[in-house]
Regions:
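Methionine residue identity
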Residues: 1-2, 8
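Terminal targeting signals and extreme-terminal segments of soluble enzymes
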Residues: 9-166
Length: 166
């Protein structure tokens, strides 16, 4: 994958993020994740995703309330918002595992098995299935507060090593 021009500036910015798994604390630096979200006007901020602390480097958790920003016209959680939640979890997980690298989603595939009504809260848990040098594969389950499955998603991330020059 070739990254050039304005996109390369974004790649350099992302690569400087200090997002990592803290071996001493046995958790991801969730405050760094939250700060990245607060600084931007990206999709995770727009949809109201809240990242939660986790005890392992290969698991990422988040929650999201179903509201006007992420519902479909009938008042249920949009399938696209569910996929965005899953891809964001996988991206954060890959970034934490690969400090100084850029992680981009190249495949997202999901199945929606139950509706989630307006005002409800979904919880998502991403588990790393494969950690290669250039590819990570994550499995994400999105559930309601009772633990019922709402969506199940697989995300593949491509890991990019930024060029050192310019």
């Amino acid at each position: 994958m070739m990254v050039t021009g304005e996109a390369m500036g974004c790649v350099r910015c992302i690569a400087r993020c200090h997002l990592r798994f803290d071996e001493k604390k046995k958790q991801m630096d969730i405050e760094a994740v939250k700060e990245i979200i607060r600084q931007g006007d990206g999709l995770s901020n727009t949809l109201g995703m809240e990242f939660l602390s986790t005890p392992e480097p290969d698991i990422v958790r988040a929650r999201m309330e179903v509201n006007d920003r992420n519902k479909q016209p009938f008042g249920f959680l949009s399938g696209g918002a569910s996929l965005a939640l899953a891809e964001n979890l996988a991206g954060v997980g890959s970034m934490a595992l690969c400090p100084g690298k850029v992680c981009v989603g190249i495949s997202v595939s999901g199945n929606h098995v139950k509706a989630m009504a307006y005002g409800g809260v979904v919880q998502a848990t991403a588990h790393l299935q494969h950690k290669g040098r250039t590819l990570h594969v994550w499995h994400i389950d999105i559930t309601n507060e009772e633990g019922d499955l709402i969506s199940t998603v697989q995300v593949t991330n491509y890991i990019i090593t930024p060029r050192k020059n310019g």
